[in-house]
């Protein structure tokens, strides 16, 4: 699967309806979006904890300290291109309700387990109305407690633990090591892993160990064809990219 990172964010402003809708037009199998909780309990699509980047440095508000109405008054598109001046921060509801039939939606939770109440409020009526959403949405997070909470609440919905790697300058080893990572996967109850596309860490043995545990395997953020082919050949379940059309065309 080709997943559009924050929507088609290589072209359109990240985490906006403009980016998500463009991703569908470009043939993405799914989109990934980042979500924070506002002061008044709404779940909104934004990567950072503040609005500085998406406002082009003009407005610096902490999302968790601000109400939805104020957040949605901010132009979050012009920093990318003036033609997107009307872009606003969407809610989780807006993104879910625009999800085409059969497409995937990876919901990256950027805050902690305090999101579970509002998340339940958004999802329950939609899951009751459209049961197939269970197979369309996935939760992803770097916080294993969030993944664990999602798995306990919705055991039939995929929830993947996210991991990136840092090289220890003294030893030259990448951290976390595989043993530590797999321990975290186990305690998170994750159904899969979304991992940084690090060729020095992710090899066939790594993938085989995941498969033995029946875990899905996803990589981010891949924008070049050579790397995409490498991970496709390793059997990756999805590739997350800023340029879904480029990667799809390159893998044909």
Short names for language-model regions:
Residues 1-252:
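Phosphate-group recognition and catalysis centered on beta-loop-alpha active-site segments
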